[in-house]
Every structure is written in structure tokens, then in C-alpha cells.
């Protein structure tokens, strides 16, 4: 029964058609591409897909075909996304499909269905148990359950369920669990359960997802509560309340057939709810409900809404939502808190909580993590049950919040136990009050702190209940406590989008809730509260019913479910589920039509968003806006309009809600809150909105419930909409609410009429469940599965009720409800769809519902399992599901959805068909769901009985026909029409629903026949699809989508479901086998694929490989466009639709990774512009077309797009997202382009990301341009317009830049005026900062304008190229086909193969080869254009980097220069003048200058910004990322920056050895000159007084008179007062004594606020040596001391002795700064001996080596790419700045070019390496052997130095290298390895000769490091170097060394090392020649600064590099060098090799 993932995969491969061609469809073992339903099938790959496909196919006789559905569903439909299945390791009972097509297999299928189904039922139930077991073997703990009753109850529930035995087992497990000490047991069991669940998932997706998850949690809870009370409850419920009877009746109507006991439990629950008095019953009933996986879940929720008080439901909803949010982000922390409180109340509730816990842990334990989510969902289910009982509700909510297993279980327990006792006791007494209190306390606990909840609960309820509630709430609250400031968070959530997401979400919800709760249940004032109140007031089912009539009840139900969903969302949010939601969220606001597309894209994006909570927050905010809009609609909708409005708004809402849940649970909530303003909390706001809407409608209860539910989840947005409520819920809460309502409707009004509102609500609820499921899927596979199951359990039932009973019954209402439901379903998508399908399939709605929910649950989990490892995947599926719905609903794409859902509708029923426009879309999305629905049937007792029933002849015929249809589809051929008719059954075989799709399939199959069989997706695209690809693909895709629900195995051919298939499409497009890889691997591996995988996998394997491929990545979001795709049945007409399918292909082709990025990007994009997502789809479609011009397109927009895509994950470059396919295309087709892409990416992020992204790139590259390019009509007018638009953007940017510049000038003028006003220092600082910032902004604006212009040109060029490539290719059908398969990489085999998702078949290879040959010519021409394009892009990047670097420097300035300095410098001259002004004569002055230049004490700009010919363009500082593509590499930003800077010749990278000191020194130097001390100046005053430490104290100059300064001490107070000490201090010292006052040194010595690296670079990089004189920051003063000891373990810790204080302290390096010495009337940094510095850095390397490195600091002047070493006597003097401002020479100088060797990059790297190696590497001693060699070499070299030099001279290359290493290792790195060895030798000998050299050497090393950074952006060292460079920025040392290194490198390379060798000949000689200037500089200082600064940061890596290059170097050196030199050579070699690397 179980299959290994690999096994399954193999089967899938076969099924997918890996070998499909080879075998007849009948004989082929269809290892189906993991159909979604298959994945859902935890037990077997069954014909659920058939049943589902039946639904999908729109078979009319759904009910008649229930046997099929039951049969299939039992095995949980086949899910095509094998990836998901694999990820979850879901096994199936039998690979039914392998034998599916043969008669024997049919017979076997029937048998297996009977047996397997039964087994599955059992498994499912057991799984359910397992789920419970997930929670723990809890379910097996039957005897230990809180009461025998429970176990019985559970058993009864089991009996109700199809598999009584299974149910019993779960019940028992639950009981045992409970007995164990539920929480612990649950927790303990959870892990095993999780494992078990995982296996279950592996075995049976259905079980895991549906049965296990839903049932596990629900059952567990039910088992605990239900076991005791299930029977009793059932009886009691029936006995107890009038509502109960209604509920029962409804339940019976809806659930009677469903053996799950949906009706019974529903009845019980309903009764319980109304009867508040029987809380225990409610709980147990609810538990039963939960127990009945889907039905129970739905029931519980519906009951809560109906039977329980609305307040309970609401509160539960809210709590759940909050919890969900918390769980997602803060669930885990909360869990811990809750655990404590929960434990306290665990006694009675233990069982229930344990059950929940089991579910939760199960999830966590599961490899897929679905269980976790599942657990959460389970918790939710339990919560729903709890909600039935007032206290239980609270606990449930609490659990939901917990989301982590512990919390949910514990909460459950607490509430359960209290509930049971309190409720039982007080049930009668406080029917409504009880509910009321519960709701309130739940609310409070969830929203507010638990304390608040307790208060509310206690005060309102009897002590018992209050206590229970309080404890429950407490637990709940504790979860939220995570976000204790939830309310605050809500308010700040937008700001704190990210933090809010994790903790805030919960809090936001919590805070609002608590207020709402406090506001009270009556809380009309606060809708949330109101909803609670309303719930309270309408505790009775009667009230619920009215609500249900109004549609308000849906809201209440939504509440409960909302929380559930939120919970799931929360979890998913982290993983990306939220992102999806978020994406959707934003879209709804944007527009219904677009949002669907976005939703489709959401799948991938979700992950991204999850990663980017902030982004998510934005989206959530956006969604919120939509929400209010929805709200407005809500009033209108609340009554009849609810369904319709809901549909439209629902989509929006769903998206919004998802967004909220996913990305920024809290922030989104906040957004909602803000917009809604109704509630303080987002949840609150949601609820309030709903409430208010409901209030308007006059349905208090309904409103409250709905609003509350929605609120919790992010529903807030939804709630405000009214429809939005449903939708929001449908996303998060809506579904659950709808589910509840659905149940209520089904139960209460199922027999009666599901009232429109009710109907829509049920729909909503289903949606929410689905959404939860979706989120769960995304979040964790195991958890997701469980959650899915759980959600499915509730949702499917609701959906089923809704569709089967309610929907079918209420055709008109259904349409409304259907829309709502559809929206909901869409959000849930897969789950809902299957449910709907299931219901139609089963004749009895209830049974179907139960089955559906179960199957759905399972199925969804399977889907999720598919993407076990990938939240995105899962999310994608769910998103897919949700998105399509949302898209349909929100977007005007409902038509498309309807079409794609048509089959679903047919399957579901004619009634469902009515909903088909809405619901079908869901189903299409939820194709998997549909199978899931079937699966649930199998799991239910009714199902089991059905399974046991023999098939009728007609059924057998139908099943066989379905098998054949499916086989044909798998094979990629069109099924026979006769088979289709038979398969669908009914009078006309449901022809109306599938004929279009079928015809499309036939056409597509004919066109792609050749490619389909063996060729992978690509081959199809390459082959027949080409011309028809555009039309056929779009048509087929659209056709596929409508025709085939994602889950429908039969519909693997592309149909309307193409959207769904998008992911599975890759499978289908790849051909049967290709789909295998594509679906299973692609879906599994890439998040996008995963997204697709859940829904589309089984669909994709079939006919539309290409389109499907494309859709893989964007399938989730593309679903939106897919709807259009459906309409796209007209091939080319619907570009968006085409885009969708094409885009998907492109995305998929692009690469899984790219796809994922793209998807993620899409969500990001969505918020920016809804159009973008469609554009993206468009783009993708165009990509297909673009295939013609793969190269050209790539080069321009594609590259940008790809860059953006790549960056998208990290940066919000959504605009380029639309070209994910292009990116893939680029990468696949043109590796070179890809690399270039990398550069543009940096550029994009740096500049386009900021500017172009929003304005230009988005429209042009965002997808419009690309899309246009990709369109068949090569360059459409649209594209041209986009290009024009881009040009306009560039012009606008220019104008903006001009404005910025003018503004900057104005500001500067103002500053100049102000500078004379004698403003306070703070004011001056602010002004200076503002001026700098403005200058930076102006610079950036300029750069941006230039870049925009360049980009526009590049885009135009790319467009032209695309046209060139496209036109011919467009005519070539083969190309379009290829395009489909490989949108972006059509031209290159690599792209084809890559695009295929790593699925390489012979066909794909052939196609790739073919494509490669076709494209060779194109590539040649395109390459040139591309090169030009890249050039332009690089130029733009350079400009951007320039601007950024300038801006970065400005921004990075630790504190702004004085106003007068600023004024002196002026806006354009500021930097240079600042440098000069800072220049100081002392050697350290240079360093100081450099620091000054960067003006960032905290952040040191590694490169010095020199005003060169570039016109003062500043290179990027360390912190600033200004990648200059000139290098052609875009690796580390910093490295890139440096490299770019170097290339720009504007920056000289200097080691910042003394950077910390440099700044200090600069300021110190200024201080030295009294002129620097002015009024308002910050100074340091030296005080030696008794009672005071003798130290330098910070002070502020208040006034200056007579050479005295009146200072106010910052840290010294008057002896007995709080006033700061003020005193007069002489500005000058007596005689030669140092003055007691000096300008304050920068805070460099203080901990930097920047990155640790920077701080370390600046401070830690300073290598402190023993004996160094330092100032230590101690007790707010700088104490002068001497380092006496260094901590060997911690480099950053030194022992400093303070002679003045006669004490020794251990100080951290960052609290040290070099002491300043008064010398020659100046403050000069007293540098430690070079040895000290080197030693500290070296660690390994001998100090001698450092000295060797250079006696004087090396200053490099770069001229004509050659560096001249200047001996700078005073590094600190202006010459240094001159060096820094290397003007023309620097401009000319290119680091890469500096060596002038063929290996320019290598030389650069070498430089870096050399510096690093000799510096940090040697110091750190990474290369120990190298060190030894070095030492040995030193002696040897010393001896043979002359000979070496001679050799070097003779061998230019060798000498150069040797020379360079001598200088700093940089040169050596650059130089040939042999040369390096020589140099090293020489260098080593020098160290012996001259020790100071090592320091210079070190400096050079540092410099080299920095420089190498520039060169080796890609190298790991680059990062280090950049850091080190930042650290070692000491201008003097860094520059001097750089000069030496560079010059040496240059000269060595140029002079063949003759010069170098000569310079190296003598220790000093070498240093001096290479760095003659350095020689003049004080060697000690230079050495100390440089070596110390360079050594630390950079050396370690360099050392490592040296080691690596050693072998190479040695090889070369050994041959050409003396053996004595070899050792050193080897070391230098290692440097070289690393640099090369």
C-alpha cells in the first residue's frame, strides 16, 4: 500500500509518459505524473482522479457517478505533481494507474478500490488517527481519553465515518493520547505522529492530508471531547436544542449519505452551539465533526457558527486567525508560553488538546512540514469544535494561535477540560452567556493577551467557565504574547511588516481581538467584538440560520475558519504561503481580473513574500485597501448580493487575506485594520468590517461570525468587503466560515434551502479551509497535508454541502454563493474543487461532502506533500487553487475560470455548474481537490460502504472510459469522443462541459503528436506546437484549464485547467514522461513548480507540454491568466491567457529556480501593479514567441528581466519579474548572457531596482515589453509603446535627476548660508547630513536617469533583437513550440534542457540540438547585439554604481562633516575638498583623509572616493552597492563596488588598516589645529583630577574666548547635581605639552552601528599589538593605555594597562582606538611597531614577512592602468588625497588592466590574493604549510633574492608575479605564479633585511585585498576583501600599499618584472621602488597602520587562497624558479590560484 517516493516517482514517470510513447496507454504503467489527486491519495494512486476528472470533466451524473468518486476519492485523487507527492513521501496502496488502462487493471482497480478504498478509508481514518497520531498516537489512546465517553464518541464518530474501524483506531489513539497527559503525550506522540504522518503522507496523501490531518486533529479533539460526548453529544445535541434539531436535520440532509457522520456531528454541533448549555456535547460533537475529517471540520465550524454562539465562533475565528498569524510567525514562541498555561488546564481537556497537539506535532515531525500546518489546521478544527462549546472554542482558538503542536493541543486541552466540565455543568445554565463568554475570552485571548481574555472570560462567565476560558485564553494569549503588543503591532504592523509577520501578526490579531472582546461580545462598536457579541446573542442555531439566510452566518463561520486559515497562513507565511496570499491580497485591491493572475503567480511569489515579510506587508496594506472597498460592497452583498459581491470581492479579499496571512500576517492585518478602522486589530478590523457590514445588513450574528473569522485571518480585508468577508475568509477565514455555513446550510438549510448568504458562506468556509489547506501546503508538507486534510475535512464538507446540497439546491444563490464559494474555493482551489466535484459525484450530498472533504483533505496534503520540501510549491498549489479563484472572482477572469471550472461544475453537478463560473474555477484549480473530495468519500463510512458496493455495469463502463480517457491524456493524445462521453456519463456525456476542451486537446494532440510521445516538453514546443503553440497553446491551455480540473487525471491534456496544469503542464508539455520529471521533479524542486505541481501535475503530463511547462512556475499565479487562457481557447486572441500558458512554459523552461523567483517576483510585482502579473503572463507567452529571438531578447530586456528575477528574491524588482521566462531563457540559451545578467542584476538592484524598477523596468521589462516581445507579433505596438515608455521614463529620470541636482544645489546654498549662522552642532550635523543626503540623491538621480536612458536604449535594442529573432521564429512553428517548452531559452539546447526542468529525453536532446543549430546564426547576430546591449547596461550600471557609491558615501558618513567644511567643499567638490581638508601631515593623516572621504566612521568606504575625470564620481563605499558591470562580474556587492570603482578609476582601494584610527586621526589632526575647535564643536577634554579617571572626556564647546574653550562635558556631572559639568579649558598646551582639549575623534573606537563586518573592519581590523598605545572607551571616557596582552582565543579582546589609573582591564577591540600623540603641534596617531600589527594579523605568518611587505606605506597612483608607487613621506598629507583622487590616472587605471597581463582578472585576483595571502592569510596561518614554506622561503629567498629577481626580469611574467608578491602579494597574485614565488622569496629575504617591510607588505596585502575585491567579485575572497578593505581603509597605508602593489603589478607585468625585481632586490629597495613614496613615509607608522589594518580582516582568506594557489604556483615556480624559491612561490601561487578562482 505504501510506495516509496522513488517508487512512486518511478511509477509517476511511467505514468507521466516518460515512456508513455513506448507503451500503449493501456499497457503503460501510468506512473501518473503524480496527479494532484494522486498526491492527495495517501493510500493509492487511484481513479480518484477519474472520479475527480469526472467532476472535472463536468460529468453530469456526478451523484450517479459517486461510486467513481468514492472509489477514486478513497484513493485520494491522483495528483500530477509527483514532486509534491514525493516530497511528502506519500505512498499509495496500489499503483492502480499502472494497470489502469487494461481490463484487468479496471477490474483490479475496482477491487483495489473496494479493498484499497476501504483500506484507504481505514488508512485514511487511521491516517486520521495517524494524524491524530500525528498529534500523537493520541488517537490510539482511546482508553486513556478523558472519559470513556469520548472514546465511545470517537468510535461512534468513526462509525459515522466510512471506516468505523479506522475511526475507532483514531479515537483510541486520541484517548490514549489524552490519557498520557495529553499535552506531553500529544507532544511526544506528535513527533512520532509527525513521522507517521509523513509516512502516511508518503503512503497516502489523502490520508495524510485529509484523513490524517483533518481527522487526526479533528478526530483527536473529537476523540477526546467527542469520544466522551460524541454519542452523548449527538444525543444531547439532538435532545438539547431546537437549533440542534435543525442542525441535525441539515446535517442529515447534507451529511447523511456521508458516512463521515457529518450530518450527525453537524447536527450535534449545531445543536451544541445553539444549546450552549451542552458545551461538552458541543465539544464532543464538534470533535466528532472534526473527527469526520472534512465534514467534521466543516461541521464544527458551521456548528460553532450556528449552534454555538456566534460569539464563540467569532471568537474562535478570531482567535484562530490570530493564532494562525501567531503560529505562522510567533506560533512557536507562543507555543512555549501556552504550553505552560495549557499544561495547567490539561486535565480534562488533555485529550482534546493532546489530539490537537498530535496534529500539530505530526505536522512538524512530518518531513513535509505539512503536518505542522495541518496541526494548526487541526487545531483549528478542534477549535471549531471547542467553539461549539464556549470554552472549547477558546481553547481551540488558543490552539490555533499556537499553531505549533504544543500550543494547539494544550489549548485544546485546557478549554476542553474546562469546557467539558464547565460547559457541561454550565451548558444548561449559560447557553448563551457561556457562548458569549467563550467568544469573548477566545477573542481576548487570541487577540489580546491571554490575561485580557481571562479577564473577559472570568468576569463574564461563571468562575468555572471563566477560569477555563481564562486558562484557555491564557494559552491563546500566550501564543499571541509572542506578539504581546499585538494591538500596537497592528498599529505599527505596516511599519513592522516583517516583525509583525512573525509576532505581530498574532499580536495584531490578538490586540484587536482583545479590544474587540473587551468591547465585548456585544461589541457593535467593534465589529470583531461585535461578532463575538453577535455570536453570543445569536448563540442559537436559529440566529445562525437567519444569518445564514442573510449570508452573515457565513461570516461567523468564517470567523472560526478564518482563524484556522490564518493559522495556516501564518505557518505558510513563513514558508511562502502567505506570500501567495499576499500576492492575491494585493491583487484583489487592484482588480478582480488581475488579482486572479497574480494569485496564480502567487504560488512562487509567496515564498518570496514569505521571505520578504516587508514586501508582504506592503501587499497586505494594499490588500487592506481592497478590503475597505470590499467592505463597501459588503453591505450590498450582505443580503443577496453577498454571493456575487463576495465573489468579486471575495477574490480580492482572499488575495488580501492570504497576503496578510502569508507575508505580513500582522502587517496585513494592520493594513486591514487601518483601512477598516473598525477594529484596533487587523483581525478586529476585519471582523469589525464584517460586523459593520453585517450590522448594516442587520445580521449581527452573521456579521460577527463572518467578520470575526475573517478578521483573524487577514480576512480583515475580506471582511470590510462584505463579500470580502467571505473572500477573506475564503482565503483564510472565509473558507472556514463558508464551510461552517455550508455545514450549517447543509445541515440546517441543506434540506431547507441554503440561503443565499448561507450558501455563499459555506462556499466561503470551504474556501477558507482550502485556503488553510493551501497555506498549509505551502508551509509544510506534512503539516500542510494535515492541515489540508483538516481544512479539507471542514472545507470539503462545506464545499460539498455547498456544491452538492447547498450549491445545487440554491442555484441562484449558488451563483452568488458559488461565486463566493468559488472565490473561496479558488483560494483553496484544489481542495474546494475536489470537494465540489466529490459532492456532485456522490449522489448524496452529505456523503459526498464527507468523502469530498476527506479526499480533498488528503489530496491537498498530497499536493502539499508533493512540495514537501517546498512551501512555495505547496503554496503554489494552494495559491494556484486560491489564485485562480481569486483571479476569477476578483479578476474579470471569472469567465475563464468558469470555463476551466466547467468540467468541475459538470462533475459536481448541474447545480455546481451554475456555480461553475465561480466554483468550477475553484475546481479547476482544485482539480486535485476534487479527487480529494472523492478520497474523502472513501474515507467516510458512506464511502466505504459505497466502495464495498459493486460497480454497476454503467459504472464499470464509465470507469473504464475514464481510464481510457485518462490514459489518452497521459499519453498526450486526445481521448476518443466516445470515451469522453462514457467517462462523463449522463445523457450527453456532459459534452457541453468538455467538448471545447476536448477539441482543443485533439487539435493540440495532433499538432504536438510528434513531439509528445518521447520528446519532453521542449520537444513539443520545438515541434508541432510552434505555430499552433501560440494559438494552440493558448487555446489548449485555456481549453485544458476549463476542461481538466487540476486534479483530474483524465485531463492531463491541456485544457482550461491549463492554468492548473501550468505546473503540471510542464509534465504534460514534456510529454508523458517529461511530465514525469517536470511534474514530479520540477514541481517538487522548484517552488513555482511546486505551486503548479499540486494542482496541475497530473494534468500537465498530457498534451500541453509546452504550455504546461511554461505554466509550471507561474501556474499558481498564471492560473489567473489561465482563466484567460481558457477563453484563450482562441489561440492568439487572449494574449494574457496565452501568456499564462506560454508564460508558464517560459517560466518553467527558464529554470526551476528562476521560475520560483519569478513566481515570487510576481507576487511582489502584483502589489506594484496588478497589470504586471498579467503582463508577466503575457511576457511569458511572449517569451514563447520570443523564442524566436531568444538571444536578442535575452540580451536586452531579458537580461534585465532575468537580473531582476534573480534579484527579485532579494530585491523588489518586480518590474522585471515579468520576464522570468526570459531569464531562464537567457541563462539556458546564453550562458554568457546569464553571467552578464548577473551584472545587470546588481545594477538593477542598485539602480534599476530603485528607479527603473518602479517606473521603467516594470512596464518595459516588467512584462509589457517582454510580453510584447514574446508575443507572436514579434514586437507588438504594445511593445513599441513600452519602449517609448521606457524612453519617457529615462527622460523623466533625467528630469528628476536635474530637479534633484537643482534641489541639491539649493540645499547647499542654504547650508552655506547656515554655516555662518553659528548653529548648534546638532543642527549643523543635521544640515550637513541633509546636504550630503541630497547630494547623494542627486547623484543617484543622475545615475538613475542615465541608467534609465541606457536601459531604455537597451530595451529598445532588445526589442529589435527580439523582433529579429522572433519574426523568423514566429513563422517557424517549431520555434513557437520550443518557445512553449522553453520560453526564454528556445534558442539554446542548454536552455531547452534547463527549461525542461532537468527532464532530458532523447526528444528533448534532439530538440535542443535542433534548436541550437537553428539558433546558432541567430545567436551569432544576437550575441553582437547582446554584447552591445550589455555594454549599455554595463554603462548604466556603472553610472548607477557611480551615483550609488557617491550616495553611499554620503549615506555612510558616520556623522556629517562640519557645515563650514561642507560649504567649503560644495555639492560637487565636497568630497575632494573634504579629503584635502582632512589631510594631515602625519603619516596617519592619509588614513584619516581616507576616512574623511568616506566620512563614515562606522562605515568605512573600502575604496577611497577620488574626484577623477569622472567628475568627482564617487565610488561606492563599503556599505553602498554600486556594482559596476565594467568588471563584467557581479559577485559580492562590495567586491563589485570596489572592482567597479577601480574600473571607473575613481576609486583607489586602500586598506583601511588604520581606518578606525584614520577617522580618529583625521579628526584628531583637525583637533590639533585649534581652528578645528569652534563653538558647538565636539571635543575631548583631558582631565586629571582626583575622583576622576585620567582620561579624555567628551564635551561640547559652548563658547571660545582668549584661546580658551568653555566646554560642557557630555558624561561628567557636577558633583552633587544632575547638571553637566562645564568648565574653561585652554585650547593650547603649555609649551610643548599637548593641549588638554582636542577635537573629538570620531566614534570609530566605539562599537560601530553598521554591520559587524564593518565594525570589525574598521575597528577589529586594526590589528592591535602588544605595546600599542590605545585609548579605551571605559566609563564614558577614553582612557589612555597600552596593550599588554592579547586574548589568544578572542582576537577582539585585549588586555590594556592604564598607567594613569594603574589598573589593567580587558577591553574589546571595538572599544579601542589608537592613542593620539602630540607631535609637532599636531595630534598624530601613535602607531605600534609594524611587527605588532603584522603579528596580530598574521597569527601564523612570521612578523618578518610583514616587514618584508613594505617598509614605507605604499601609495599608488594609477595612471594608464599602471600604478606608480610613490614614496609618500606623509601619507596623511594632501598627496594622499591626491592619490585617492587619482583623477585621470585613476580613471585610466583599471584594476583589471593594471597588471596588463593576459590574465587581467587573475592579476587583479592575484593582487587581492597576494594581499590577502600575505596579509590575513599568512597572519591567520590558514596555509600552515605555506607559512612554513614562507619561512623557509624567506631565508632561501633572502639568499637567492637577486637571482630570483634576475630571473623575473628575464621572465617578465614570472618576475612580475614575484615582484608583486613581494610588495603586497597583490602584485604577486596578479603576476604569474612563478613570478610570485620569486617575489615572495625576495620579499621574505627583505623581511629579514628590513622588518618594517612586513607591515607595508601587510598593508599592500590589505590593499591588494581591497583591489582584488574589485577584480574578484565572484571570489569568496572578494567579500572578505571588501570587508577588510573597509577595515583597512587607512588612506596612507591602504593607498601606499595599493600603490605599491598595483604599481608593482603593473610594472612587473609591463616590465616583465624587471623593475619589480630590481625594486624587490633589496628589502627596502623593492618596497621603495615599488612604493617609493612609502619609503618616505614613516615606515613604522605606515607599517603599523597598514599591516595592522590589512592583516586582520583580509589575511585569513588570503592565506587560504594562497594555500590553494600554492600548487599551481609551485608548479610554475619549480620549473622556472630555484627550489629555494619554490616554497614561497607555492604560497604566492596559492594566492594566484585563489585570485584566479
UniProtKB/Swiss-Prot annotation:
Keywords: Nucleus, Stress response. Residues 853-865, 1179-1189, 2028-2037 have a biased composition (Basic residues). GO terms for cellular component: nucleus; plasmodesma. Mainly expressed in seedlings, flower buds and stems, and, to a lower extent, in leaves and siliques. GO terms for molecular function: promoter-specific chromatin binding. The keyword Isomerase does not apply. Residues 141-179, 454-487, 504-531, 567-637, 686-705, 837-893, 1011-1045, 1148-1197, 1729-1748, 1793-1812, 1841-2037 are annotated as: Disordered. The keyword Nucleus applies. Signal peptide: none annotated. Interacts with importin alpha IMPA1 and IMPA2, required for nuclear-localized proteins import. This is Protein SWOLLEN 1. It comes from Arabidopsis thaliana (Mouse-ear cress).
